[in-house]
Every structure is written in C-alpha cells, then in structure tokens.
C-alpha cells in the first residue's frame, strides 16, 4: 500500500545525525539531504484533486439535433493537477547543528521541523564534542594542514611518547583552570566542589574553546593520533593546537585529519552514511534519536549519559581505539 505523502511529511520532525565525509562542504550535505527528501516525498501518493460540479452535455434532443441535455457531473479541478501546479513539496527547512569545515569529517547533526528549535536548545545546553585528531611531526605549514604551503621542516628524532604526554597534561591542566574561570560559580560553594569532583563543571555561557580531556591514542613517529574532548571549539582551533604541540616539543607538526566522533548525545554509530540519506533511513534515525533528544527539549540534559568519560593523558598507554561515547 502506497504511503500518503502528507502523513509521511508530518513524521519528519526531530533531530538526526549524518556522517559528513571529508572534502565536502556542510552546505552540500544539507542540500543533498533536502533534495533527497523532496524527491521521495513527491513520489509518494498525493492528495487527490478537488472535485467540482459541471453541467456536461449528455446528448441531443429534437428533430434538428440542436437541443442539448446537460447533466450535473463531478470532474477534477485541473488547477490541482501536478502538471499545472507543480510538485506538492518544494522546500523543507533542514537546520544544521555545530558545523564541520570542508576538510573535517564525522558526526553532523541536522534538524527538520520542530527539530530546528531543538538545535537551538542543544546549542544552549553546551554539550561537549569528541574528536580524533591526527598529526604529523617534522613540518609546519601556513594553515596547519599537510596540504598548506610549507614554511618549516624540522627533525623529530628526539620526541618520545612520554614527552608528548607531558605536553598534553600541561594543556589539560591549563584548560581546567579556564573551565573553572568560565563556569561563573562561586568557587567556595558546595555546588562548585561537587561538580568539580564529579567532572561535570561546565561553562553555561559562550566561552573560548576549552579542552576538557586529551590523550594520545597512537604514537608512531612522525605520525601520532590524539583523542580530544572539548567544547566551543572550531576545527581550525584543533589544527592550530597540533601546530603548537609541535612547537612545545622543539619541533613542528601539521594536522592531517580532524574527525568528530560525538556531538553531545549523537555518536558515529547513529550517524547515517551517504548511501542512507533517504526518506526511510531518516525517518528511522529520527525515531531512534527521539529518546536521546528528550533531555535536550527539557533543557536539562543527562550529561553523564550524553557525553561519556573525559579522556586524560595518564590513560594514554592503556590502548588505542576510537573515542568512547
């Protein structure tokens, strides 16, 4: 049985996540999702055309055949025909969450219908995000990426994993101080103490980028991989941080990959691949993510469930892998 397009359209309200590949602009991702939805909605069963009563000729009477009998008949209104009025659905407002630049990849949250309001609520909730960031030692470029114009080449034989982890510990300690400063809580209060002990201290206003946790997942010179949990960041800020880590190690470094593995309650596991950017998959993703977004709509998110553990440099030797959500 064919689905009724208006009924399907009414189900498209909520948040879902897609996986943005590298080298693709976020606007292209959003426009592709919108185009696919419109195409499939217009292919579904539409409302039938309105009917109007017309008096149509039913035959002739009289010897000369000029007298015509007209009978009332219901005929469709031609103005409602798709070839006259065009497709029923021409625009769907698809909103975007925290964006990824063209070189980055990973979790990209989108909203449809009242999901656009949830995007604003999600922004005001100040969720953290997880990234896997890869760097390469021995070179510095103008834009901090391996494709940028090279401005310096250095040696890196003196760098060890222990030296790298000491730098990461300094970064995390410095950012913890910034976190306390921007939390706008009375540092002598019991509330501030409890939040700090539980690792739930967060700035509830817009602040500079803050690194909540950072650790080394892999160290194979000249390449290394970091796991970073942060908030209020940009991808370029993370690339610059790789550059500064290289300088602190008396060398240089460029960023070769920035991949977001979690944005608030949304993880890679619940993100739709490019082959899944269709109506059915998006409907299913919205249903599955509804429970995760209930806390966002209430304005009181369960941070511990949504954000997961904070990585730290001291756990760097425990093993390698993706970010935990």
Swiss-Prot record:
UniProt keywords, alphabetically: Isomerase, Mitochondrion, mRNA processing, Transit peptide, tRNA processing
Purpose: Minor enzyme contributing to the isomerization of uridine to pseudouridine (pseudouridylation) of specific mitochondrial mRNAs (mt-mRNAs) such as COXI and COXIII mt-mRNAs, modulating the efficiency of mitochondrial protein synthesis without changes in transcript abundance or stability. Also catalyzes pseudouridylation of some tRNAs, including synthesis of pseudouridine(55) from uracil-55, in the psi GC loop of a subset of tRNAs.
Origin superkingdom: Eukaryota
E.C. number: 5.4.99.-, 5.4.99.25
Family: Belongs to the pseudouridine synthase TruB family.
Active-site annotation: 101 (nucleophile)
Pfam families registered for this protein in UniProt: TruB_N (PF01509)
Protein name as annotated: Pseudouridylate synthase TRUB2, mitochondrial
An annotated GO cellular component: mitochondrial matrix
GO biological process, one term: tRNA processing
Catalytic activity: a uridine in mRNA = a pseudouridine in mRNA; uridine(55) in tRNA = pseudouridine(55) in tRNA
Main location: mitochondrion
Subcellular location: Mitochondrion matrix
Keyword tRNA processing: yes
Chain intervals for the UniProt region annotation (Disordered): 292-325
GO MF term set: pseudouridine synthase activity; RNA binding; tRNA pseudouridine(55) synthase activity
Gene that produces this protein: Trub2
Alphabetical list of Gene3D superfamilies matching this protein: Pseudouridine synthase
